[in-house]
Amino acid sequence: MHKLVTGRILILPLIAAALCAGSLLPAQISTVAFQPSKLSPEQQGDLFMARKMFREAIEAYREAPQTSAIVWDKMGIAYHQLGDLAAAKKHYEKAIKIDPKYSDAINNVGTILYSQKNYRGAIARYNRALAIAPGAASIWSNLGTAYYARGKYPEMSQAYAKAIQLDPAVFDSHNALGTTMQDRSVGDKARYHYEMARIYASAGNKELALQYLRKSLEEGFKDKDKIGKAPEFDAWRDTQEFKDLIALEPRVL
């Protein structure tokens, strides 16, 4: 099931990329009065999206140039937010037909396939998008999530590490507008949070590593021997903070 959060799809599934040329920037949206008649149709749609008025956004985007892959992608995102995955996919594919190298739309089709548990298909789309836009942190994070769903933990770690390298805040961004959807829903949350702890530990981010490690324990991760032997935690293993965390017997959420 898709749960959409501003900036991403949290499947744990978000609208995460910056707005493209010709669209309103988030800072503008916070200061511009709601006067649709003074805006272009695409800008009107962006403003409706920021206000979570998705049906109105779709109507506004339909008045924008229909030769724009970006507009079709944004309509797809609006349908995605409404939970109409069939319509969302149709609009993403139209965007790709207009611009076969539009990585955002290719990624967004991947998020549809992910929600349908077609993880192989999702991975193929994400890799295709990354071949075009290798610097897109949100797509790397989507790839990692899909690998996790298939139980491919080393591949997940590599993809997530790349995402964090490109954007250290990739898992915490809350951009209200954009053209890229980001997946974040997983099954085994305890194992997921443990893997996230290892990834952040490898990146040297102690605060987030221990935060995710605590979450994994709260979600029921029981293999403390695995935690104790994981080389990613070697730098902190003898600290009192780490010892106290491992000694905890938290109430499972």
Stretches found by the model and what they are:
Residues 2-39, 50:
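Long, contiguous interaction/recruitment modules in multidomain scaffold/adaptor proteins
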Residues 28-38, 178-183, 187-190, 208, ...:
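Terminal, low-structured helical/coil segments at or just beyond the last alpha-helical repeat
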Residues 36-83, 111, 115, 196:
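Alpha-helical segment of the N-proximal tetratricopeptide repeat
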Residues 38, 69-72, 103-104, 137-138, ...:
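Helix-start (N-cap) detector for alpha-helical repeat units in TPR-like alpha-solenoids
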Residues 64-67, 98, 132, 166, ...:
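Structural marker of alpha-solenoid helical repeat scaffolds
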Residues 74-77, 81, 108, 142, ...:
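Canonical tetratricopeptide repeat
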